[in-house]
Structures are given as structure tokens and as C-alpha cells.
A protein has these predicted regions:
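Alpha-helical transmembrane segments and their immediate juxtamembrane cytosolic regions
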Residues: 1-165
């Protein structure tokens, strides 16, 4: 470990994010007045968003990666709706895995535009990011359009060697 540097592995980040998310969900469901638990939970999303961007670049099969996110989003929606709205289907708010699926689909679209039109990545990412943002807003996915953009920003930073595991 370097001086004044905290070295965390991908596993360390996942465990930290899962712990933060657990504290958040326990606060929401069991201790609704303990706002500090919700604040701790806010740490989870950017860590998971970073991990999704990293996973996109590290996977050997991006199509399967994106499909797995979609399957997890669909499978987890009913338990999410039951836990957070008390009904099996709540079209007004979707779980965070939808946000990550939309982001992966936008990354896939940006890659396709870059390859087919031979555009630099920032130009190819613009229409994909716009579409992802709008879809996140329309679906009312957790963290909405800005959540989708968060994953895309982490992915672009990785492309530009600004941060990676």
C-alpha cells in the first residue's frame, strides 16, 4: 500500500457496497427514522456503478453480460416492489438493476456506433448516453437518467485511463 493511498480490490469494493446497501435497506424497512442508515446507503450506488463499468470492459461476452443484467432486473423486480411499495407490481419505480441494464445497453450502443461509423468514443457515446438517460427517466429506474450516466462516465474515465482496478 502506497503512502496516503487506500488500495481496495474489486472484492473489497463489492463487500463495502453490499454492506452499505444492507444498512440502507435495513434503515428503510426496519428503522425509518434512522436517517444516518440511509446516508450510509448512498455510498453503494457509485461503487456498484463503477463495478458495472469495470465489468463491461473485463467481460469476455458483452451480450451475455447485458442479458444477465436484464434477467436479474426482471427477477428482482417483484421482491423489490413488495419490499419497498408493498405491492407485487409497482410501475412507478424500478430497481437499480434496470439502471445498470440500461447503462450496459447504452455502452453496447456506443461501441456499435464507434465501430460502424468510426467515430471517436466521446462522439459515439453522446447519442447512446442521451437515449440511456431518457430511458432511465421514462422507466423511472432507480437513480433515473443520472444513474445511467454515472455508469457511462465511469466507463469513459476507464477508456481515458482516469481510473480502473
Amino acid at each position: 500500500m502506497g503512502k496516503n493511498r487506500l488500495d481496495l480490490s474489486a472484492l473489497d469494493l463489492k463487500l463495502l457496497a453490499m454492506a452499505a446497501m444492507l444498512v440502507d435497506h435495513m434503515g428503510y424497512l426496519l428503522f425509518p427514522t434512522a436517517m444516518w442508515m440511509r446516508y450510509v446507503g448512498r455510498l453503494a450506488f457509485p461503487i456498484f456503478a463503477f463495478q458495472i463499468a469495470e465489468g463491461w470492459y473485463r467481460t469476455h461476452d458483452r451480450e451475455k453480460y447485458t442479458l444477465r443484467l436484464l434477467i436479474c432486473a426482471v427477477v428482482s423486480e417483484v421482491p423489490f416492489d413488495l419490499a419497498f411499495s408493498g405491492t407485487p407490481v409497482d410501475a412507478g419505480y424500478q430497481n437499480v438493476l434496470w439502471t445498470f441494464f440500461i447503462a450496459a445497453a447504452a455502452l453496447w450502443a456506443a461501441d456499435a456506433l464507434q465501430e460502424r461509423l468510426r467515430l471517436p468514443l466521446p462522439l459515439a457515446a453522446l447519442p447512446a448516453a442521451g437515449a440511456g438517460y431518457l430511458l432511465g427517466e421514462w422507466m423511472q429506474a432507480d437513480y433515473f437518467g443520472p444513474g445511467v450516466l454515472t455508469v457511462l462516465v465511469f466507463a469513459l474515465c476507464r477508456q481515458w485511463h482516469i481510473g480502473r482496478l
